[in-house]
């Protein structure tokens, strides 16, 4: 009897690009020795749209609709960073009510983002049921967004100096009801997932990152906090009014895929705590800084010339960005979302550099999957939580 010869050479496999509802248009070139991963090369750029260059010939108000297309599952954060930069450049004060509204919207957006991470992550490792469950709660959040902003996604709600509109009548009660309901939903997820032996088999001791490695690779967000580093920009930078609320930074020390799952589940609970405190303590007053309406517009601007008057309505009130540079950052669901902004006394930014958390967190993927099994790639990639819109920009 002849024994079939076994192949000794390595196999190269293309994984992706995937459907946008899962991991987006990310392509991985994986080198395999049987089931073992020898090498992995991510290929990016399929969703590159030149977002940084577009910013250089748009005013901030004109650019706001573009930024919601970076991380299209947590659009409030991209809007927040876009208005925070010019606010700091122009030293524009935010009314207290507007700051509270912003915090509420940001934390709701964080929960929605974590929910839509949880569903596909569980589907990746073989649990289909949570994928359908998460849409119940996420739909309620989108109903709240729609009532306040008019849009379920791509809200275009933040403005320099405040927000576009005040909260509608009855919205606060509706949001408090959601918070009470959502806490029971998280308990259901934890019962279903956290102690499940098949789930634990797939995620424990898979994709381990030490605290030192996480810092050296520049990781942020749940990737960093799951490796034992208590670093959250909401505590570090005290932007908006986070220092007025009672909440804790959520972290784990194991550094594996399970730790990253636990950090995100705990973060959703903390977000609910912040939202409840903000809703109960929200002050009255204006929802935007009315001084911002009277920005110093350029005298005799070409926009006021005769030939421009009949093209469309005049552009929104805007102001010159001072000739200086600035780095602003917020704690987005995926990590540190930053903008490096250079003004040059023009209504357009001279440079608008985006620091997306997903792009930097993704750099460690080839190191994490080496010497792992092929099936573990989806577990590790899912635990990183990437959105290709912000990775490719």
Swiss-Prot record:
The gene is ndhH. This is NAD(P)H-quinone oxidoreductase subunit H, chloroplastic. NDH shuttles electrons from NAD(P)H:plastoquinone, via FMN and iron-sulfur (Fe-S) centers, to quinones in the photosynthetic chain and possibly in a chloroplast respiratory chain. The immediate electron acceptor for the enzyme in this species is believed to be plastoquinone. Couples the redox reaction to proton translocation, and thus conserves the redox energy in a proton gradient. NDH is composed of at least 16 different subunits, 5 of which are encoded in the nucleus. GO terms for cellular component: chloroplast thylakoid membrane. The lineage of its organism: Eukaryota, Viridiplantae, Streptophyta, Embryophyta, Tracheophyta. Pfam families: Complex1_49kDa. It is found in: Plastid, Chloroplast thylakoid membrane. It is a peripheral membrane protein. Belongs to the complex I 49 kDa subunit family. Transmembrane segments: none annotated. It is an enzyme of class 7 (translocase). It comes from Acorus calamus var. americanus.
């Amino acid at each position: 009897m002849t024994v079939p010869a076994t192949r000794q050479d390595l196999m190269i496999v293309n994984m992706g690009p995937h459907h946008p509802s899962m991991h987006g248009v990310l392509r991985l070139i994986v080198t395999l020795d049987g089931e073992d991963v020898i090498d992995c090369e991510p290929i990016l750029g399929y969703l590159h749209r030149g977002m940084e260059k577009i910013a250089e010939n748009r005013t901030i108000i004109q650019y706001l609709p573009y930024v919601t297309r970076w991380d299209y599952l947590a659009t409030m954060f991209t809007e927040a960073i876009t208005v925070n930069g010019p606010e700091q450049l122009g030293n524009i004060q935010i009314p207290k009510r507007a700051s509270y509204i912003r915090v509420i919207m940001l934390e709701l957006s964080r929960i929605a983002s974590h929910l839509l991470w949880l569903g596909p992550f569980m589907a990746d490792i073989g649990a289909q049921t949570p994928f359908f469950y998460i849409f119940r709660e996420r739909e309620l959040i989108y109903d709240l967004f729609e009532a306040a902003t008019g849009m379920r996604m791509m809200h275009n709600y933040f403005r320099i100096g405040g927000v576009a509109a005040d909260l509608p009548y009855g919205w606060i009660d509706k949001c408090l009801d959601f918070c009470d309901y959502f806490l029971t939903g998280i308990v259901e997820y934890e019962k279903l997932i956290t102690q499940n032996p098949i789930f634990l088999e797939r995620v424990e001791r898979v994709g381990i990152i030490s605290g030192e490695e996480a810092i050296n690779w520049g990781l942020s967000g749940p990737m960093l906090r799951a490796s034992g580093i208590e670093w959250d920009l909401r505590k570090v930078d005290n932007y908006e009014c986070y220092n007025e609320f009672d909440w804790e930074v959520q972290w784990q020390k194991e550094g594996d895929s399970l730790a990253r799952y636990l950090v995100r589940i705990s973060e959703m609970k903390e977000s609910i705590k912040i939202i409840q405190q903000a809703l109960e303590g929200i002050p009255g007053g204006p929802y935007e800084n009315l001084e911002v309406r009277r920005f110093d517009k350029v005298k005799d601007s070409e926009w006021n010339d005769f030939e421009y008057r009949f093209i469309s309505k005049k552009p929104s009130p805007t102001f010159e960005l001072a000739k200086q540079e600035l780095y602003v950052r917020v704690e987005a669901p995926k990590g540190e979302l930053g903008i490096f902004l250079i003004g040059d006394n023009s209504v357009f930014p001279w440079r608008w550099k985006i620091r997306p958390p997903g792009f930097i967190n993704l750099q460690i993927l080839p190191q994490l999957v080496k010497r792992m099994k092929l099936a573990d790639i989806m577990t590790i990639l899912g635990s990183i939580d990437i959105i290709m819109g912000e990775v490719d920009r």
